[in-house]
Amino acid sequence: MDAPRLPVRPGVLLPKLVLLFVYADDCLAQCGKDCKSYCCDGTTPYCCSYYAYIGNILSGTAIAGIVFGIVFIMGVIAGIAICICMCMKNHRATRVGILRTTHINTVSSYPGPPPYGHDHEMEYCADLPPPYSPTPQGPAQRSPPPPYPGNARK
């Protein structure tokens, strides 16, 4: 099933675009009744302020959209460049899973670890705290703390 299509009328879009440019040109350049806010003082028919018109069109949202679009396109280009560089690098090396003999010789040339006679972690260390005893130790004879300097009782 085909989706319903709009009737195609050739030659409709072009006249509308021409009318748009004609009216936009009038408002941009001439001081008519529709573009008084963009006009400056002067006698020439072309006295509209292009900067005011452009500033009105390019609001903060439009500028933010343009900046976001440029940053997005730069990110896409950077991602493509990284992919291309990685593919070029991978094609220069050998295939995955095949090691070069120099790498194998380098790994096998290192000496093995020394033999272990006993487990070093199980050695008794003299710095261990005393074992736990359930009987409480006697109270330590301590002197009372010094009096608080701000509260003197009389």
Curated annotation (Swiss-Prot):
This is Cysteine and tyrosine-rich protein 1. The keyword Acetylation does not apply. Residues 128-154 have a biased composition (Pro residues). Residues 124-154 are annotated as: Disordered. The keyword Signal applies. The lineage of its organism: Eukaryota, Metazoa, Chordata, Craniata, Vertebrata. It is found in: Membrane. The chain crosses the membrane at residues 62-82. It comes from the Eukaryota. Residues 83-154 are cytoplasmic. PANTHER family: CYSTEINE AND TYROSINE-RICH PROTEIN 1. It is a single-pass type I membrane protein. Belongs to the CYYR1 family. It comes from Homo sapiens. Widely expressed.
